[in-house]
Amino acid sequence: VYKRQDYMYSVREGWVVSKDNISEKIMGVDVSHHNNDNSEGVINWAEVANAGYKFAMVKVAGRSTGADGNLYTDSYYEENIQGALAAGMQVGAYFFSQSMSVEEAVEEANYICDLIAGYNITYPVVFDWETTSGYRTEDLRSNSELRTAMSIAFCDTVKSRGYDPMIYINKYDYLNYVDTDKLSSNYDIWLAWYWNDYYETGEL
């Protein structure tokens, strides 16, 4: 029986999620305006750090999912970066991408790098390209050549700006819709692996 706290600490189907009984594990949080815009109030970063979390991956900006594809900044990115840094945590940043071309991916990379300039960003700057029905990118999901090229363009631009790049992608898309050899041999991968066979107890 696996519980939620075990998800990072197991080996399944040949994929190393982590090692059993690992003592060097580093816990982190993924935050965006969704965490701030709720009824629970302001994030207490001191409490987060005291709970053992060592790093924060902060959503800094994105591109709208509509046809216009406008760039936007996360309304709480500065507050979240400053709060995490003040609590002594390491900070990384990510861009919610809706790029449909290499040129747009480069634009997104420069946009986020401009926003985080001046902050001590020691964790990766991440390309978080996503799609689903109704998104401007919905017809590009299986376009492996373009998705790979956009990922490379974003990462190379981020690297040229002095940051460590990373690619966020779910397991299925990683195995089916990008060139894994080109990406994994050159860039770090933040692999999202969503479990969907929960019992009511929260165990599987």
Where would I find each of the regions flagged by the language model?
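Solvent-exposed, polar/charged alpha-helical surfaces in well-ordered, non-transmembrane soluble domains
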Residues: 46, 50, 79-82, 86, ...
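Glycine-rich anion/phosphate-binding loops
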Residues: 73-76, 100-113
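Surface-exposed substrate-engagement region within the catalytic domains
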Residues: 115-125, 129-204
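Short, small-residue-biased leader/transition segments that mark boundaries at the very start
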Residues: 1-2
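Solvent-exposed N-terminal domain segments of exported/luminal and surface proteins
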Residues: 5-8
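Structural recognition of the beta-strand scaffold that forms the well-ordered cores
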Residues: 26-30, 54-60, 90-95, 123-129, ...
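Solvent-exposed loop/turn segments at secondary-structure junctions
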Residues: 33-38, 55, 61-66, 97-102, ...
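N-terminal carbohydrate-binding/catalytic regions of secreted carbohydrate-active enzymes
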Residues: 10-92
